[in-house]
UniProtKB/Swiss-Prot annotation:
Residue ranges of domain HD in the record: 128-259
Cofactor, free-text remark: Binds 1 zinc ion per subunit.
Class in the EC hierarchy, top level: hydrolase
Species this protein is from: Dictyostelium discoideum
Reported regulation of activity: Allosterically activated and regulated via the combined actions of GTP and dNTPs (dATP, dGTP, dTTP and dCTP): Allosteric site 1 binds GTP, while allosteric site 2 binds dNTP. Allosteric activation promotes the formation of highly active homotetramers.
Chain segments carrying region Disordered: 1-24
Chain residues that bind Zn(2+): H131, H170, D171, D254
Family label: Belongs to the SAMHD1 family.
Protein name from the UniProt record: Deoxynucleoside triphosphate triphosphohydrolase SAMHD1 homolog
EC number assigned by the record: 3.1.5.-
UniProt catalytic activity: a 2'-deoxyribonucleoside 5'-triphosphate + H2O = a 2'-deoxyribonucleoside + triphosphate + H(+)
InterPro entries xrefs: dGTPase-like, HD/PDEase_dom, HD_assoc_2, HD_domain
Gene Ontology CC terms, in alphabetical order: nucleus
């Protein structure tokens, strides 16, 4: 096999239940009888968020114009109510439905949120479709709350609307198996580059052009695109750009939703309470700041992210399958021209997780090698995890792209193409920095001034380092696992390094299915 996927540099930096415990009196704030809102929304009582109204003797609520006093809703189509396992009953405005009811957005149903992790955790089969709707819901809820609690900011309906749209469309550009696809494109080399955020903006433009959404002009699209990327923020009103994609400290509603949603479907509990973060925050000097006592909640947010990456998203079996899918795509690329469909959204729309099944059921002889790899995935004949080492930057004595070559030289009968080197970085979404140190806080006693809090003033149990680097070795040939492991450990010994004992697998186990 002409292998181009020899090593992987993976950096998981941010740059990718059923009922909520709401206080009813808090929830109905913003809903009241209004002669300007003729739409009457009936909610099923007895479960979810609206069940809390029963004790108040309220069976029907009318949507408030509190957030949009200058809007005539009588001419608008009805919004929809979606019952979500994470956020309960979500009201989806008609302008959001205009985007949802398109083939470009519906494609997200065929993109699993956790990529190849679903091969390891079978209940985690949720898609980017519901995640994107959830992010839109939280984005709207967040900016609506800021508008109500801080009217002096004069947040416009346009800003509220576009923040929701940005939350909805931020993942439109993901490819098959999400981040695994981006890694595969990077390994192709040459001029091939792919960033899902850029494709998301292309898909957004296509939706607007293709479906006659003429109310959005070029300035509107530019604004929404900046919200998706979290870039090109002006000095004034910079806080609006922190809601969906926060490049300032990585605290955003995208993270709120996927950490909660993934944990739910993975059967894992999460300690972070993102509802409190939204409730106890305010804008000071054009930056979203948090109540000082929420600093522990913020650390829980980033620790939850780190734990999911370490234990779930980078699970060795999931990564093994990811490498096999990458090899299958590489073998199929010359025939299917997958890498030629990365620029035009009208071609890219055909790339989803179903590409695997498309290859698997094909009859073309040109796809035989790819079909064989996919068959091995189905039969659980996977690439084998050989070894892992945790390293410090100052102790690395080789580059990742030369390690496979070094192992092949030391070993007997080992080819470079037998080896996959994964260079993995795990962190708090801010590379090697503490994201909380880039976050500002306020106190109840003076909510007009913001400040930072040193971690030494918070707790001595907060880590001193915020990024760890690991080197993992996988082998494509189960017959050569023992030789690869022996050669790798010889290299480690030469560099005064030792493998990670918690992940070390004996050669005898290596030849079994994982």
């Amino acid at each position: 096999m002409n292998n181009t996927f020899k090593y992987v540099n993976e950096d998981v930096s941010g740059t990718e239940g059923e009922e909520s415990d709401y206080d009813p009196s808090e929830f109905i704030r913003g809903y009241h009888e209004s002669p300007r809102s003729p739409r009457l929304i009936d909610y099923e009582m007895g479960r979810g968020l609206m069940g809390n109204f029963k004790g108040l003797g309220i069976n029907k609520v009318r949507q408030s114009n509190e957030y949009d006093n200058d809007t005539d809703y009588s001419s608008r189509k009805s919004s929809k109510i979606i019952n979500d396992v994470i956020h309960g009953h979500m009201e989806v405005p008609d302008y959001i439905m205009d985007f949802i009811d398109t083939e470009q957005f519906q494609r997200l149903r065929d993109l699993k949120q956790v990529g190849t992790t679903s091969f390891v955790f079978p209940c985690a089969s949720h898609s980017r479709f519901e995640h994107s709707i959830g992010v839109s819901h939280l984005a709207g809820k967040y900016i609506d709350r800021i508008k109500v609690t801080q009217p002096e900011l004069e947040i416009t309906e346009r800003e509220q609307k576009f923040v929701r749209i940005a939350g909805l469309c931020h993942d439109l550009g993901h490819g098959p198996f999400s981040h695994a696809f981006e890694s595969w494109v990077d390994q192709l080399g040459g001029s091939k580059r792919f960033h899902h955020e850029d494709m998301s903006i292309k898909m957004l433009n296509w939706i607007i052009d293709d479906h006659g959404l003429d109310e959005y002009d070029s300035d509107d699209i530019k604004f929404i695109s900046s919200l998706i990327q979290g870039k090109h923020r002006p000095k004034e009103r910079a806080f609006i750009y922190d809601i969906v994609a926060n490049n300032r400290n990585s605290v955003d509603v995208d993270k709120f939703d996927y950490l909660s949603r993934d944990s739910y479907y993975l059967g894992r509990s999460t300690v972070c309470d993102f509802q409190r973060l939204m409730e106890f925050s305010k804008v000071i000097d054009d930056q979203i700041c948090f109540l000082s006592k929420e600093i522990y909640n913020l650390y829980e947010l980033f620790h939850t992210r780190y734990s999911l990456h370490k234990l779930v998203y980078t699970h060795k079996v999931g990564k093994s399958i990811e490498f096999m899918i990458a090899d299958a795509f590489t073998e199929a690329d010359q025939f299917l021209k997958i890498s030629d469909q990365l620029e035009d959204p009208k071609e890219f729309i055909n790339l989803s997780d179903s590409l695997l099944r498309r290859i698997e059921t094909s009859k073309e002889p040109e796809l035989e090698k790819s079909r064989k790899i996919i068959k091995n995935i189905r039969n659980r004949n996977l690439y084998k995890f050989v070894d892992e080492i945790i390293v410090s930057t100052d102790k690395i004595r080789w580059s990742a792209d030369s390690l496979a070559e070094d192992i092949a030289k030391v070993g007997n009968g080992i080819l470079e193409s037998d080896i996959i080197v994964q260079n993995l970085k795990l962190n708090y979404a801010f590379k090697d920095k503490d994201p909380v140190q880039s976050t500002r806080f306020y106190t109840r006693y003076d909510s007009t001034q913001s400040f930072t809090i040193k971690k030494e003033e918070t707790s001595h149990l907060i880590p001193n380092q915020f990024q760890e680097e690991r080197i993992r070795i996988f082998c494509r040939s189960k017959e050569k696992c023992e030789q690869v492991q022996t050669a790798f450990r010889k290299l480690l010994k030469n560099h005064n390094l030792s493998p990670n004992p918690s992940f070390t697998v004996s050669p005898a186990r290596n030849i079994k299915k994982i």
